Amino acid sequence: MKPPLEGITVIDVAEVWAGPMGASLLGDLGATVIKVESFPRPAHTRRPGSAMAKGYTNNDPWGPRPWDRSATHNMANRNKYGVTLNLDHPTGLKTFKRLAEMADVLVEAFSAGTAEKLGIHYEAMKETKPDIIMASMPGWGAQGPYQGYVSLGSGLDGFSGHYALRGYPDNDPSMTPVVNHCDAIGAVTLAFAVLVAIHHRNRTGEGQWIDISQVEGFLPHLGRPMMDYVMNGRKPVPMGNRDHHVAPHGCYRCRGEDSWVVITVSSDQEWEALRQAMGDPEWSREAEFDCLLGRHGNQDRLDALIQEWTRGLDKKEAMRLLQGVGVPAQAVLNDEDLYADPHLEARGFFQRAGHPSIGEYLYPGHLWKFGKSPRPPFRAANGLGE
């Protein structure tokens, strides 16, 4: 048996996270992915000191081959080969088009208009390879009033309203941490769209251009607040860890430094189970907590009382106890916890790969397990030009 995309060649000229990670997902499915980087201006995530190049090996951005040391770059570019070309030079552009002749898919994530300036837009690529599939994923898409805007994940999160939803009621958006959720969703959106285009080409022989707006790919993930606004006129506000409809619904401190467990109770049956798990304290039998409406209307006191109980427990002990009686609960894990987690280890999620410049590490691995199709070998990110 072969991996699903064995025999498919992808050229990746995307920058930062969404596009490169989407191309890596195609590599996870068995495609041969070739990352084309400009020289002498390599990818943002390779440049020491760049805002996008974070998490250096041994916390040293200026070690051997500093352009290979960024954690961001290494995560988003696994399972790829690489080549450096100066696309502003006629020879570099000619070489790129020769490479495109052998490819099935081209991925770019420039701001709208940049591919045209470089001469690698879809019409030019179609002349080179008539059945090529080209995916463009500027932040706001290739058409519309914002088509030329330059964007990064934080700006797209702001445009989508995600910043306004996260955080606590007494904090403004300036206190909201950056998560770049748009980038993660953009990567999966890209991979899905390319798979659909490959299926179409297999049926018809036709390539096509895919216009992906990262913002539009993200907005459905905010479906409830958006639809609540159009259906009920309610403007969403940040609520911390709370929910519009159920309580308790929060994150509670446990024993130990920076130790937490999240708990959700969405029915009277789960509330009864939580009460019994806590030892049925006298306060839990008070009338104000008898029903969902009462619990939802008294969340400040309820959360404080629950936290008095969780403070005496290890976070995983609290999780196992509550899960054992049917109450949704999860210990809040940090990176150290994740790499030591027995469930992820048993499923073989983390994959070990060695890189000549930074050494051998465990990487978050393939997102899928197929019953019939094998997974291709897992490789660390390519070195510059390798």
Per-segment meaning from a language model:
Residues P248-V325, A329:
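Aromatic-enriched alpha-helical interface/lid elements that frame and gate functional surfaces
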Residues P64-R65, H73, M239-H244, C251, ...:
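Short Gly/Pro-enriched turn/cap motifs at secondary-structure boundaries
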Residues P40, W140-G141, Q214-L219, G256, ...:
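Glycine-rich beta-alpha junction loops
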Residues A142, N171-N180, N202-F218, V237-H244, ...:
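Conserved Rossmann-fold dehydrogenase catalytic segment
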Residues A187-Q208, P220, R224-N232, R275-E282:
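Oxidoreductase and adenylate-handling cofactor-binding alpha/beta cores
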Residues M1-R203, G383:
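N-terminal helix-loop segment corresponding to the beta1-alpha1 unit
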Residues D290, S357-E386:
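Flexible, small-/acidic-enriched active-site or ligand-binding loops
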Residues Q323-R347:
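Conserved PLP cofactor-binding pocket of PLP-dependent enzymes
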